[in-house]
Amino acid sequence: MKLRLGLPKGSLQEATFQLFKQAGFELTVRSRSYFPSVNDPELEVVLMRAQEIPRYVHEGVLDAGLSGLDWILENEADVVEVADLVYAKSTPNPIRLVIAVANDSNIKSVSDLNGKRIATELVRVTQKFLRENGVNAYVEYSYGATEVKVPHLVDAIADITETGSSLKANNLRVIATILESTTKLHANKESWNDPWKREKLQNLAVLLQGALRARARVGLKMNVPGDRLDTILAILPAMKQPTISQLVNSDWVAVEVILEERQVRDLIPALKRAGAHDIIEYPLTKVIP
């Protein structure tokens, strides 16, 4: 038996392949191929546009897939969310679907969009947001290059932004956020009800989420004199309690801890001053709580 899995082709492909590699899955794809090989005989991987994956999962063409919440909502796909995977093309943060207008536009708020023309790839999601805010505007589908359509072709756009740099480069300002979106591992309902496929998906989710957790953390090892241990422990942040091991024939102990990478820059000098020796920092592949 195989699990048929849809992965996004295009801007999110490289980040997705890197995540799968960290999780233990080697994906190899030939030029112009849409069917990568993978070092797991129980997986069949198909590359396609993220916009289409939820529809094919909903219809049962795929057992499961990775796509953003925005595209799941746009496709009105009735699927099972297996795991929330917070990563994007260039940052580890959620993306936003925003409404933006030209910097010099008279449009200041959502209510000013009444009777205006808006371009977007996410027509249904945008229309729903406008209805909920009592706005009657014309929403048209954009086939790409959405940012350049303001103000010459449309009054506003609803577009995905990760860092905001593209909007700024096109002299646009945000007047509203429609939603925040993260990548979802989602499954077809019938596939989810199959015990083998459910277990396979749950195992995949554990590995992918473990890989994402590891990206923000590192491990630290150090040797500490016994009389300095309490001082060292007082300044060590940790997921749980640090691991402490007595060194053979010594009054020293080995201390090991997992912590946020952003803490290391200030922590290592502090540990050294507090009496720690032989400090080693090492990367993590997966963190499974």
Curated annotation (Swiss-Prot):
GO terms for molecular function: ATP binding; ATP phosphoribosyltransferase activity; magnesium ion binding. SUPFAM superfamilies: GlnB-like, Periplasmic binding protein-like II. InterPro entries: ATP-PRT_HisG_long (IPR020621), ATP_PRibTrfase_cat (IPR013820), ATP_PRibTrfase_HisG (IPR001348), HisG_C (IPR013115), N-reg_PII-like_a/b (IPR011322), N-reg_PII/ATP_PRibTrfase_C (IPR015867). GO terms for biological process: L-histidine biosynthetic process. Gene3D superfamilies: 3.30.70.120, Periplasmic binding protein-like II. CDD domains: PBP2_HisGL3 (cd13593). It catalyses: 1-(5-phospho-beta-D-ribosyl)-ATP + diphosphate = 5-phospho-alpha-D-ribose 1-diphosphate + ATP. Its cofactor is Mg(2+). It is found in: Cytoplasm. Transmembrane segments: none annotated. Keywords: Amino-acid biosynthesis, ATP-binding, Cytoplasm, Glycosyltransferase, Histidine biosynthesis, Magnesium, Metal-binding, Nucleotide-binding, Transferase. The keyword Ligase does not apply. It comes from the Bacteria. Catalyzes the condensation of ATP and 5-phosphoribose 1-diphosphate to form N'-(5'-phosphoribosyl)-ATP (PR-ATP). Has a crucial role in the pathway because the rate of histidine biosynthesis seems to be controlled primarily by regulation of HisG enzymatic activity. Belongs to the ATP phosphoribosyltransferase family. Long subfamily. This is ATP phosphoribosyltransferase.
